[in-house]
Amino acid sequence: MILVTGATGAVGREVAGRLADAGPVRILARRPERLTVRGTGVEVVQGAYGDRAALDRALRGVDAVFLVTNDPTEPDDERVAAAAAAAGVRHLVKLSMMAVEEPDAEDFITRRQRENEQAVRDSGVPWTFVRPRTFMSNTLSWAPGIRSAGVVRALYGDAPVACVDPRDVAAVAVAALTGTGHEGRAYAVSGPEAITAREQTAQLSRVLGRPLRFEELGVDAARTALMAKYPPPVAEAFLQSAERQRTGAKASVVPTVQELTGRPARPFRDWSAEHAEAFAPE
């Protein structure tokens, strides 16, 4: 039995769906009503990471875990890893981030992810880390501005990033969960090319068949917007991450998707064509 966490998110949803197509899968969900993965082989345990009793129920009889955590202010990786060790789990595949490999990345979120990875190592459960670059699906946050005004606003227009389709990240994770020889490995995962926000805007314009305008926000405006949504350390982490991207730190392409799945990573032009409806006027 494989336990999937984060199954309402971009990657966890895909991991759960792929596993459910092949056999039984268990999902730990704080809000089960938000799950889109259904089926006779899908078992759902309601609970949060801070609920040890729910964790113990979810982990009973489980061989492997796909772990996704989202709140860098909470010790959720440590909680799950400790419970997994107590339950005798044989493999824990954690969704991390490629920035942990960058020596100059010292923002709050990246530091916490390094600490989270170490907590998993320290648990004694055999581990695999999947470290993706920025998700292509993050551009869905542009949809309201595109639909209402035909405009994309982002901090830097010409900062390249080798963004990756969440489905490719999920495929790598499933390969690690169901294959052999992945324990003790960390897999960086990128898309097939580095692309800028301005280039993404142009691609979306082609897909939608309508002109789109790109507007660069500037640091002050971006900080104001982020501070309205996130705690200060998290908001500042996003700004520092964007600055690293501006200097080219996120442009490297790696062949992991091809190596682990046998097919090339999807480019942004394919992702945008498949998700055009999300950006189309209502």
UniProtKB/Swiss-Prot annotation:
What name is this protein filed under?
Answer: (4-alkanoyl-5-oxo-2,5-dihydrofuran-3-yl)methyl phosphate reductase
Keyword vocabulary terms for this entry: NADP, Oxidoreductase
Please name the gene that encodes this protein: bprA
> InterPro entries given for it?
Ergot_Alk_Oxidoreductase, NAD(P)-bd_dom_sf, NmrA-like
Judging by the UniProt lineage, the source's domain of life is Bacteria
EC identifiers of the protein: 1.3.1.113
Chain sites annotated for binding NADP(+): G6, A7, T8, G9, A10, V11
Key word Metal-binding present in the record? Answer: no
Q: Which family does it belong to?
A: Belongs to the NmrA-type oxidoreductase family.
Tell me yes or no: is Oxidoreductase among this UniProt entry's keywords. yes
One Pfam short name: NmrA
Q: Which organism is it from?
A: Streptomyces griseus subsp. griseus (strain JCM 4626 / CBS 651.72 / NBRC 13350 / KCC S-0626 / ISP 5235)
Q: What does this protein do?
A: Involved in the biosynthesis of A factor (2-isocapryloyl-3R-hydroxymethyl-gamma-butyrolactone), a gamma-butyrolactone autoregulator that triggers secondary metabolism and morphogenesis in Streptomyces. Catalyzes the reduction of the butenolide phosphate produced by nonenzymatic intramolecular condensation of the 8-methyl-3-oxononanoyl-DHAP ester.
Provide the catalytic activity annotation. a [(3S,4R)-4-alkanoyl-5-oxooxolan-3-yl]methyl phosphate + NADP(+) = a (4-alkanoyl-5-oxo-2,5-dihydrofuran-3-yl)methyl phosphate + NADPH + H(+); [(3S,4R)-4-(6-methylheptanoyl)-5-oxooxolan-3-yl]methyl phosphate + NADP(+) = [4-(6-methylheptanoyl)-5-oxo-2H-furan-3-yl]methyl phosphate + NADPH + H(+)
Its Gene Ontology molecular function terms?
oxidoreductase activity
